[in-house]
């Protein structure tokens, strides 16, 4: 038997190293198992044929040549098929082949030419084949938003959102993705209807999946009656529609959020103002109550003083009346006179301008 100069199984191993970066694939693994079993069957069959050749050589030399020619042609075909199968096998079959090659080449010495040739061929094949790069996955561009928005400036009374959507879809304007209706705020001056709990909406927005559908809907239904069943609730109401060019649902939600935040801010300011006014009012009420209590106490004090003064005057008048009643007839007042005694003044307290008596003057004239 001639030794092989090129090891085909090692070449397949290098190809497997190139494809090892692709990861695990369950389908490829199942196919490789089937190919491995098929190849093992072909190996055993080739071995049996080689044994038959040796038996024929011993028995009959003439028949050996003919049988060898036939067997060689068959073996060439089988080896060609076998080589094609080897080129398509995966990593699991190649590892087994490498083990078999090592067993077959073990008889060859390291210094033999067959060994050196096989070694050089394997090194050249492993270094010559470049690695295949994976194609990059194509990034799909984001889908454009092709929706259209229609604005309804007025709506029929008590019309609900799902009823509006069904009315538009029955007329062929679909698909409708979103509907938003603004609830009507009742005026403070108007009468309050407590019995009717149905909601009314002031205006609304409808988003269609296609701009074309939105434009056709606005152009077709604008300034036309709602129609439908003749005795229906909304038969005679008129559509008021307008297609908003370049307007998206995100803009509407942003506007709604901004209006809601502004409304909440105004409500907070009004609440704080009302609380301050209530606080001032309560303080004024408390202060007024205190002043009323003080005034009430002062009035009671004045009233008590006036009553005491009146009682005293009445008592004085009563005593005077009783005293006057016993003195004169019929209560006539009598005038009484009292004699006053002259006050005696001492000698040392005589004034200088007082006149002296005649006796005293005579005595004094004699002395002085």
UniProtKB/Swiss-Prot annotation:
Coiled-coil boundaries: none
Composition bias type Low complexity, residue spans: 120-129
UniProt name for this protein: Pre-rRNA-processing protein esf2
Keyword Transmembrane helix part of the UniProt annotation: no
Entry's localization field: Nucleus, Nucleolus
Function: Involved in the small subunit (SSU) processome assembly and function, and in the 18S rRNA synthesis. Required for the early cleavages at sites A0, A1 and A2.
Entry-linked Gene3D superfamilies: 3.30.70.330
Keyword list, A-Z: Nucleus, Ribosome biogenesis, RNA-binding, rRNA processing
Compositional bias of kind Basic and acidic residues: 20-34
A single GO BP: small-subunit processome assembly
Organism name: Aspergillus clavatus (strain ATCC 1007 / CBS 513.65 / DSM 816 / NCTC 3887 / NRRL 1 / QM 1276 / 107)
Biased composition range(s): Acidic residues: 49-64, 86-103
Domain of life: Eukaryota
A cellular-component GO term for this protein: nucleolus
Region Disordered, annotated ranges: 1-144
């Amino acid at each position: 038997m001639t030794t092989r100069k090129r090891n085909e199984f090692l070449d397949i191993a290098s190809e497997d190293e190139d494809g090892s970066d692709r990861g695990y694939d369950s389908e490829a693994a199942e196919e490789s198992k089937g190919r491995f079993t098929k190849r093992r069957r072909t190996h055993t069959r080739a071995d049996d044929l080689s044994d038959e050749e040796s038996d024929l050589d011993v028995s009959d030399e003439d028949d050996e040549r003919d049988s060898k020619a036939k067997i060689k042609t068959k073996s060439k075909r089988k080896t060609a098929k076998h080589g094609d199968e080897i080129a398509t096998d995966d990593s699991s079959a190649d590892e087994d082949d490498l083990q078999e090659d090592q067993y077959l080449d073990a008889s060859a010495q390291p210094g033999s030419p067959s060994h050196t040739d096989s070694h050089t061929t394997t090194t050249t094949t492993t270094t010559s084949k470049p690695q295949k790069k994976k194609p990059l996955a194509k990034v799909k561009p984001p889908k454009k938003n092709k929706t259209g928005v229609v604005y309804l400036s007025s709506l029929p009374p008590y019309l609900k959102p799902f009823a509006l959507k069904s009315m538009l879809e029955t007329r062929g304007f679909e698909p409708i993705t979103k509907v938003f209706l603004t609830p009507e705020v009742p005026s403070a001056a108007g009468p309050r209807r407590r019995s009717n709990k149905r909601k009314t909406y002031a205006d609304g927005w409808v988003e269609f999946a296609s701009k074309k559908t939105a434009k056709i809907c606005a152009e077709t239904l604008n300034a036309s009656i709602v129609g439908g069943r003749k005795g229906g609730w909304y038969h005679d109401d008129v559509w008021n529609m307008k297609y908003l060019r370049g307007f998206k649902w995100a803009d509407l939600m942003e506007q709604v959020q901004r209006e809601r935040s502004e409304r909440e801010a105004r409500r907070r300011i009004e609440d704080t103002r009302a609380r301050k006014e209530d606080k001032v009012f309560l303080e004024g009420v408390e202060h007024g109550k205190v002043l009323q209590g003080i005034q009430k106490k002062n009035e009671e004090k004045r009233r008590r003083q006036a009553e005491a003064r009146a009682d005293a005057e009445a008592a004085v008048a009563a005593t005077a009346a009783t005293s006057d009643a016993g003195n004169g007839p019929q209560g006539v007042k009598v005038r009484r006179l009292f004699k006053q005694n002259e006050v005696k003044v001492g000698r040392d307290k005589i004034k200088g301008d007082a006149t002296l008596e005649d006796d005293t003057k005579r005595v004094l004239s004699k002395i002085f």
